[in-house]
């Protein structure tokens, strides 16, 4: 019995899967790096749309100090991801920053949820919950750190 040649669709499918396997994690790392650098830079220059959210959540620290500090932290994470510099340390800073983003859910649920209902997110709540995607991204990126 002769084998039929793969269809164009199957060849395209194999090529796409091969491309994603070869470049997916690298592009994910670069994309997350861009997000951290961009969002961090906005905090440093005082143009972040989450300035008020941060200042209302981390109310025990002066926002004039903390927001730019957080911005520098995020830029460091972004550059570390982009250049694969001290990736273990970079990922530690990444995890600490992401853990901090969920503080609003615990400390200021009135900001994150409508009418106190955890199923009804506010815009700020959606902003925080979307960080679940960044957590998953961090897990994938972290899986590429070679053991020493």
Features from the language model and the residues they span:
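Membrane-interface extramembranous regions
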Residues: 1-148
């Amino acid at each position: 019995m002769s084998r039929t040649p793969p269809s164009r669709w199957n060849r395209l499918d194999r090529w796409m899967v091969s491309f994603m396997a070869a470049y997916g994690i690298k592009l994910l790392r670069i994309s997350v790096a861009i997000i951290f650098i961009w969002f961090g830079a906005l905090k440093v220059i005082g143009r972040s749309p989450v300035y008020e959210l941060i200042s209302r959540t981390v109310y025990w620290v002066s926002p004039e100090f903390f927001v730019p500090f957080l911005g520098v932290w995020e830029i460091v994470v972004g550059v570390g991801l982009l250049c694969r510099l001290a990736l273990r340390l970079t990922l530690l800073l990444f995890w600490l920053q992401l853990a901090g983003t969920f503080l609003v859910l615990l400390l200021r649920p009135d900001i994150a949820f409508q009418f106190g209902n955890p199923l009804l997110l506010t815009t700020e709540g959606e902003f925080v919950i979307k960080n679940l995607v960044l957590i998953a991204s961090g897990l994938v990126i972290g899986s590429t750190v070679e053991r020493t």
